[in-house]
């Protein structure tokens, strides 16, 4: 808490922070709710589109499962009591985000109508979801120019891994 308060009140050109500490800095509850509602709306639209196509029953079931998971996250967020003494990511005044070792965030869920495609993750890592939400916020305040990802690890598994990294940016 003290470290985040110093970042928020200080006049720093750069702050270097480890991944584990970065993940502990939450987005505001309101922003998390709005982003989850956007994701639920997107998947609802995709479900309706898949229902209109014939032979997409498996895909619809998978997307319904994802929608249920997102709704559970939203309900959990709504049930949480808010701590007033927590400095949120928005309050830090960050205007540029450089992420080293960005390959650690490759497990971001991707819902799609395609089936049996190698590398499409059916699970979602919390740290990846957190980074995705923070990147969406950075896109809002910088016009899509506030994020830089760096890694020395080559794309190894599939094109979906590259697509996932590009979704952040």
Regions found by a protein language model. Name each.
Residues 103, 142-158:
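Conserved helicase ATPase motor motifs in RecA-like P-loop NTPase domains
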Residues 162-169:
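A short helix-turn-beta junction within AAA+ P-loop NTPase domains corresponding to the substrate/partner-engaging
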Residues 1-137, 158:
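SF2 helicase/translocase NTPase motor core
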